Amino acid sequence: MTMEKTQSGQTNPKTIIGIDYSLNSPAICIAGDNFDFNKCSFHFLTSKKKHIGQFGKNIFGYEHKEYNTPIERFTNISSWALDIIHKHKEDTAKAFIEGYSFGSKGQAIFQIAENCGILKYRLQMSPTILYDTVVPSVV
């Protein structure tokens, strides 16, 4: 499947991806071009054993991998996200990433930015995934 051209010459993706990207519990929703909750798949990372597994027919929890450095942590999270996206998308997709929350303070804001920066860089390197950032106030 490829992206269809609109009358204005822009392309419409067949797979829409919503990403709420955090350090502790990032989540991804994979949807077709016509949203139907029952046809979506929802994926999240967790450190809590009770939240690992399948819930209903379309919600999946995955365990965080262990890490030794912050960069290893960020790489693990972005690898998980890209694996989920590539497994569940069609040929081309459009991802929407929730932007940064300005409520974050101190060292956390830098880790959040570095984490998301790695994901955005890796998405940019994937020719079949376009992405946009959506500010939290409109989500």
Predicted regions and their residues:
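Phosphate- and other anionic-substrate recognition elements at nucleic-acid/protein interfaces
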Residues: 2-139
